[in-house]
């Protein structure tokens, strides 16, 4: 695979290899055959980052080969959304002959939605001044005149210039309901929107007969919290990143959801609060004992759950675990399987044509 070519004819084979690999990894914990959720074979990535290469008067996007570290010119990127591909051409055309925009520009980041909105961030090794702002405003207006719903941001050391806003609002159809998600530039969002919809619908389906409340760790912008709220009396969710918490609070209001509470704290801190080890000012006014959480949802970073959080989640009758790294999932299952059994297993092909796998398990208490 190269940045400008996807081996779409190999999609079925690469997916079958992942299914077999996941089933083998999970064999010590479950004999289940994974439920498989396929990705679109192209234009599935909603965000992308490129370095810029200045070659005389020429200017183009580049990526680096992971093995050789050699430079690869990228004029089209079929893994990315159609909107990103359109913007790549438009940005090069708009920046190439404009000194204020081109000088010391070293990277462009693209974030798009299925609702055809975009934030484009231009990263510089220089101070950004009023001349840059005027040139960027003119470029933004020219892009909008082409029918592109785009917002531009300039970034440099200790500097961030938003021409109007640093976010876009995604609208996802999830099990018959549209959910609005505010996505903030430079914050985590699910890269494969079509796969995200399938993950949300799977999580809804496996929790459809739930009782009591839901506790979620690592909630981000409320991606799962908002979708799962309809299956539970109340949802209590934690997140450490301020921009993600702010986006989650906006999303709760925008979707008119009244049973989700977001707390800004790390999963490890919440574990300490639940165990009575420490008290936190951020929990003032929140009576944790009022929540009857029978299900806990975790979507941890690649490192998986730490040992204290492992112990904490074992106290819940049901554990819904979305993993971006099956190796750390299996490491966690060495502990979790002592008290719980795997009752559902899913593979989400979040990153086609790579070795990466995203998977989900539902664990029920023995």
From Swiss-Prot:
The active site is at 324 (nucleophile), 358 (proton acceptor). CDD domains: AdoMet_MTases. Pfam families: tRNA_U5-meth_tr. Its EC number is 2.1.1.-, 2.1.1.35. It comes from the Bacteria. GO terms for molecular function: rRNA binding; tRNA (uracil(54)-C5)-methyltransferase activity, S-adenosyl methionine-dependent; tRNA binding. S-adenosyl-L-methionine binds at residues 190, 218, 223, 239, 299. The keyword Ribonucleoprotein does not apply. It catalyses: uridine(54) in tRNA + S-adenosyl-L-methionine = 5-methyluridine(54) in tRNA + S-adenosyl-L-homocysteine + H(+); uridine(341) in tmRNA + S-adenosyl-L-methionine = 5-methyluridine(341) in tmRNA + S-adenosyl-L-homocysteine + H(+). One of its GO terms (cellular component) is cytosol. Keywords: Methyltransferase, S-adenosyl-L-methionine, Transferase, tRNA processing. GO terms for biological process: tRNA methylation. Belongs to the class I-like SAM-binding methyltransferase superfamily. RNA M5U methyltransferase family. TrmA subfamily. Dual-specificity methyltransferase that catalyzes the formation of 5-methyluridine at position 54 (m5U54) in all tRNAs, and that of position 341 (m5U341) in tmRNA (transfer-mRNA). NCBIfam families: trmA_only. This is tRNA/tmRNA (uracil-C(5))-methyltransferase. The lineage of its organism: Bacteria, Pseudomonadati, Pseudomonadota, Gammaproteobacteria, Enterobacterales. The gene is trmA.
């Amino acid at each position: 695979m190269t940045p400008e070519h996807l081996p779409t004819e190999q999609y079925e084979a690469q997916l079958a290899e992942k299914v077999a690999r996941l089933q083998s990894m999970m064999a010590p914990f479950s004999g289940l055959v994974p439920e498989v959720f396929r990705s679109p074979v192209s234009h599935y990535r909603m965000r992308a980052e490129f370095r810029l290469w200045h070659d005389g008067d020429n200017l183009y996007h580049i990526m680096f080969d992971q093995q050789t570290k050699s430079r690869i010119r990228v004029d089209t990127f079929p893994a990315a959304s159609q909107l990103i591909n359109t913007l790549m051409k438009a940005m090069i055309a708009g920046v190439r002959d404009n000194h204020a925009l081109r000088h010391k520009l070293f990277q462009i980041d693209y974030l798009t939605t299925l609702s055809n909105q975009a934030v484009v961030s231009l990263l510089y090794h220089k101070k950004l001044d009023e001349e840059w702002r005027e040139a960027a405003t003119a470029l933004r207006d020219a892009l909008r005149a082409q029918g592109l719903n785009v917002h531009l941001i300039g970034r440099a050391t200790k500097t961030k210039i938003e021409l109007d806003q640093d976010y876009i609002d995604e609208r996802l159809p999830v099990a018959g309901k549209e959910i609005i998600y505010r996505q903030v530039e430079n914050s985590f969002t699910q890269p494969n929107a079509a796969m995200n919809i399938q993950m949300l619908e799977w999580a809804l389906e496996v929790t459809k007969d739930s009782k009591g409340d839901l506790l979620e760790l690592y909630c981000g912008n409320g991606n799962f919290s908002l979708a799962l709220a309809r299956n539970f009396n109340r949802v209590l969710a934690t997140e450490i990143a301020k921009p993600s918490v702010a986006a989650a609070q906006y999303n709760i209001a925008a979707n008119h959801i009244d049973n989700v509470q977001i707390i800004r704290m790390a999963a490890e801190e919440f574990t300490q609060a639940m165990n009575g080890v420490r008290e936190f000012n951020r929990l003032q006014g929140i009576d944790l004992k009022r929540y009857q959480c029978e299900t806990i949802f975790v979507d941890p970073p690649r490192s998986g759950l730490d040992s204290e959080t492992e112990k904490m989640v074992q106290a819940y009758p049901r554990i819904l675990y979305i993993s971006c790294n099956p190796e750390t999932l299996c490491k966690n299952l060495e502990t979790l399987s002592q008290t719980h059994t795997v009752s559902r297993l899913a593979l989400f092909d979040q990153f086609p044509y790579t070795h990466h796998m995203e998977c989900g398990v539902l664990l029920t208490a023995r």
